[in-house]
Swiss-Prot record:
<feature type="binding site">
    <location>
        <begin position="38"/>
        <end position="45"/>
    </location>
    <ligand>
        <name>ATP</name>
    </ligand>
</feature>
<keyword id="KW-0547">Nucleotide-binding</keyword>
<dbReference type="Pfam" id="PF17757">
    <property type="entry name" value="UvrB_inter"/>
</dbReference>
<keyword id="KW-0067">ATP-binding</keyword>
<keyword id="KW-0378">Hydrolase</keyword>
<dbReference type="GO" id="GO:0005524">
    <property type="term" value="F:ATP binding"/>
</dbReference>
<dbReference type="InterPro" id="IPR024759">
    <property type="entry name" value="UvrB_YAD/RRR_dom"/>
</dbReference>
<feature type="short sequence motif" description="Beta-hairpin">
    <location>
        <begin position="91"/>
        <end position="114"/>
    </location>
</feature>
<keyword id="KW-0347">Helicase</keyword>
<protein>
    <recommendedName>
        <fullName>UvrABC system protein B</fullName>
    </recommendedName>
</protein>
<dbReference type="Pfam" id="PF12344">
    <property type="entry name" value="UvrB"/>
</dbReference>
<keyword id="KW-0742">SOS response</keyword>
<dbReference type="InterPro" id="IPR036876">
    <property type="entry name" value="UVR_dom_sf"/>
</dbReference>
<comment type="function">
    <text>The UvrABC repair system catalyzes the recognition and processing of DNA lesions. A damage recognition complex composed of 2 UvrA and 2 UvrB subunits scans DNA for abnormalities. Upon binding of the UvrA(2)B(2) complex to a putative damaged site, the DNA wraps around one UvrB monomer. DNA wrap is dependent on ATP binding by UvrB and probably causes local melting of the DNA helix, facilitating insertion of UvrB beta-hairpin between the DNA strands. Then UvrB probes one DNA strand for the presence of a lesion.</text>
</comment>
<dbReference type="GO" id="GO:0009381">
    <property type="term" value="F:excinuclease ABC activity"/>
</dbReference>
<dbReference type="InterPro" id="IPR014001">
    <property type="entry name" value="Helicase_ATP-bd"/>
</dbReference>
<dbReference type="Pfam" id="PF04851">
    <property type="entry name" value="ResIII"/>
</dbReference>
Length: 655
């Protein structure tokens, strides 16, 4: 029986069947690296889902940010409802790593806010990988950062079954070693409680708590229970308990690690003292001795990851454990938007290293803290088995290494690439104004990209003064406001959106029929071939899609982007004519705006809310926030969190 079973009412269309067969054939032949060059809107995710079903391999999908990873996670969950589709991103809502600024003698301590829902999902991902083989993990570049050894993590996991011989104290001891906290009052995630011969455990991976009933030294019953009422919801014959944290170490390993940490500390203190760096020596000794004491007493300490080299028994320079190590040997990796994701993976190590060097140099951390790090790019390369790079504009790295480059140019919708028109820079503002008016009459929208923030502001002000309904998008606008701006553009609240880097906004909007690129011949990051092709793709969701590039000189980037788009457009039109396909603009439903669902604090005089109602309101918003996080709607969850903080501040002031 197949492990992976794709569930979709759609069949592969356009170039999808050819792409699926070619990629599957490559994987079956043992090809290590392949590229799917798929235009915007060609259904690359659906192609990937079909490939996974056909090759039947556990799969890691890497995206370059949390939001896109969440979208992919939701899509794969719909495609594979009967399989383990997991989500693995950084669990920090807010993260300020520890750092030291020598110029001002300022130490910035680590400050973070952990999203509990995401932590649950991270544990769910690692547990699925160690317990089943039908797993798809959608991840950000967090997957290359260090976590505990899968051998230690799996070794500490233990299964129980009705009829097994277990002493009560043995189970309690195992739970403590696995970093579960005994708390007979607060039954939170990662806690357990004991009542006579009954042990109740609240696991970290989000499943309901489990009750283990003993009769003497024998397990008499195992059942899932309701966390609030304690009522039994399901009887079980067996149950697997996994560690509460990814960094778990056995006592023998811990003793060895503590000895090695102490030896390294003595060596480093000697270096500082010989160099007359007495302040650094005192600072390092005080912090490290405290951490050693915590490790001896609790098996854990704040910032335990900085001792990961010693705790996992690694040597200097040895590859750290990451999520990739939890996968079996024969797995598939898919890099989404590879032209952005790969440079991000490549850059993680150097940024982390530079910050740690300063901390080590000034006595805030032992040198081995530098080994708590993301994978270097060469280590990432050696960790992958078979890989598919996915992008509309793959980079030179992917193309040079891929033994098979598969093009997916024909869209299932029949939509063709937009027509690209070249016009002179002189008079571009007035020329564009005429085009904007034409689109506004047809209830269509326009995206305009400028070279600088000042140009975008000036253009927006000028158009607004002469009656154009226009808005400006810039990097300082927060996520929630950005979502509102895009929503208002789609609804027709305004007709023109101006910005500098509209690529990163993910603006694939069916209402947009014109993309205007001002000063397109000014070579640079946002006017190179890749960026131009990506920007052109913003007009590919509308049947009337056009792109106007204003240039004085036909640069290589402009020539190549125009030629590639023109070639694809001809192929698409020819295919449609041959098969009698009539293109239609993509349909995407607009979500109803939540008018009263969230509390609009700015528009409400919250000082007049009675105390009792305020308490209830905070409670309701907290429930909504948890629900939003569970649905991966992190923007809404963050908004609710901020509203709760405001209300709690008011409550504190009035009490």
């Amino acid at each position: 029986m197949k492990k992976f079973k794709l569930n979709s009412p759609y069949k592969p269309l356009g170039d999808q069947p050819k792409a699926i067969n070619s990629l599957v054939d490559g994987i079956n032949k043992g090809e290590k690296e392949q590229t799917l060059l798929g235009v915007t809107g060609s259904g690359k995710t659906f192609t990937m889902a079909n490939v996974i079903e056909k090759v039947q391999k556990p799969t890691l999908v890497i995206s370059h940010n949390k939001t896109l990873a969440a979208q992919l996670y939701e899509e794969f969950k719909e495609f594979f409802p009967d399989n383990a589709v997991e989500y693995f991103v950084s669990y920090y809502d807010y993260y300020q790593p520890e750092a030291y600024v020598p110029r001002t003698d300022t130490f910035i301590d680590k400050e973070s806010s952990v999203n509990e829902e995401i932590d649950i999902m991270r544990h769910s991902a690692t547990q699925s990988l160690l317990s089943r083989d039908d797993v798809i993990v959608v991840s950000s570049v967090s997957c290359i950062y260090g976590i505990g050894s899968p051998e230690d993590y799996g070794e500490f996991a233990f299964g129980i079954a009705v009829g097994d011989n277990y002493d009560r104290s043995d189970i309690i001891r195992k739970l403590v070693f696995m970093q579960y906290e005994r708390n007979d009052i607060e039954f939170a995630r990662g806690h357990f409680r004991v009542r006579g011969d009954v042990i109740e455990i609240n696991p970290v991976h989000g499943t309901p708590p489990v009750r283990v009933e003993l009769f003497g030294d024998e397990i008499d019953a195992i059942s899932l229970i309701d966390k609030v009422t304690g009522k039994k919801t399901e009887s079980l014959k067996r149950y697997m308990i996994f560690p509460a944290k990814h960094f778990v170490v056995g006592q023998d390993k811990m003793d060895t690690a503590i000895r090695n940490i102490s030896d390294e500390l003595d060596e480093r203190l000697n270096e500082f003292n010989l160099s007359n760096k007495l302040l650094e020596a005192q600072r390092l000794e005080q912090r490290t001795r405290f951490d050693i004491e915590m490790l001896q007493e609790m098996g854990y300490c704040p910032g335990v990851e900085n001792y990961s080299m010693h705790l996992s028994g690694r040597k200097w320079g040895e590859k750290p454990y990451s999520l990739l190590k939890y996968f079996p040997e024969d797995y598939l990796t898919i890099i989404d938007e590879s032209h952005v994701t790969l440079p991000q993976i490549r850059g993680m190590y150097n940024g982390d290293r530079a910050r740690k060097e300063t901390l080590v140099e000034h006595g805030f951390r032992l040198p081995s803290a530098k080994e708590n790090r993301p994978l270097r790019f060469d280590e990432f390369e050696s960790s992958i088995n078979q890989i598919i790079y996915v992008s509309a504009t793959p980079g030179a790295y992917e193309l040079s290494r891929s033994s098979n480059i598969v093009e997916q140019i024909i869209r299932p919708t029949g939509l063709v690439d937009p027509e690209v028109i070249i016009r002179p820079v002189k008079g571009q503002v007035e020329d564009l104004l005429g085009e904007v008016k034409k689109r506004a009459k047809k209830d269509e929208r326009v995206l305009v990209t400028t070279l600088t923030k000042k140009m975008a502001e000036d253009l927006t002000d000028y158009y607004a003064k002469i009656g154009v309904k226009v808005r400006y998008m810039h990097s300082e606008i927060d996520t929630l406001e950005r979502i509102d701006i895009v929503d208002d553009l789609r609804r027709g609240t305004f007709d023109v959106l101006v910005g500098v880097n509209l690529l990163r906004e993910g603006l694939d909007l069916p209402e947009v029929s014109l993309v205007a690129i001002l000063d397109a011949d000014k070579e640079g990051f946002l006017r190179n071939e890749t960026s131009l092709i990506q920007t052109i793709g913003r007009a590919a969701r509308n049947i009337n899609g056009q792109v106007i590039m204003y240039v004085d000189e036909m640069t290589d980037s402009v020539k190549n982007a125009t030629a590639i788009t023109s070639k694809r457009r001809k192929i698409q039109i020819k295919y449609n004519e041959k098969h009698g396909i009539v293109p239609k603009t993509t349909k995407r439903a607009l979500k109803d705006k939540k008018v009263a669902e969230d509390l609009d604090i700015e528009g409400t005089d919250i000082s007049k809310i009675p105390k009792d109602e305020l308490r209830l309101l905070i409670s309701d918003l907290e429930n909504d926030m948890k629900e939003a996080a569970a649905k991966l709607d992190f923007e809404r969850a963050a908004s609710l969190r901020d509203q709760i903080a405001t209300l709690k501040g008011l409550k504190k002031d009035s009490s």
